Amino acid sequence: MREPEGGSAAPPVRYHVGDLAVARIAARRARTVPGVVTLRADLSQTLLGLAGTWLSPDPVPAELRAEGVAVAVRGDRADVRVTVVTELGHNCRDLAATVQHEVGAAVRETTGLDADVRVTIADIELP
């Protein structure tokens, strides 16, 4: 690493990534995993979403929605909970492992945070 002129090293970078930013990253990546039909919001997210539609005239684009993902950022770690719906024919354990891996990688790549990802399969759609 190159030192700046004058011989002193640059101070360490301090930053904070918000819960919503991490949730959007996680939701976007989870939706791309084969076998994930949709993300499912829990009751608290549903109620917040209803309140948000009354307060905000501009809807959030689908690719930026974070329903189905709950995040708590603490220091250099993010606790991420993802709730998905799959379709019949996908192995739930394999799907959960893939979502966990993909979401964790996306959060690390984008934010630099280590992520503890928990996946819940809320429903299986039948043909």
Provide a role label for each language-model segment.
Residues 104-108:
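Short amphipathic alpha-helical signal-transduction/dimerization elements
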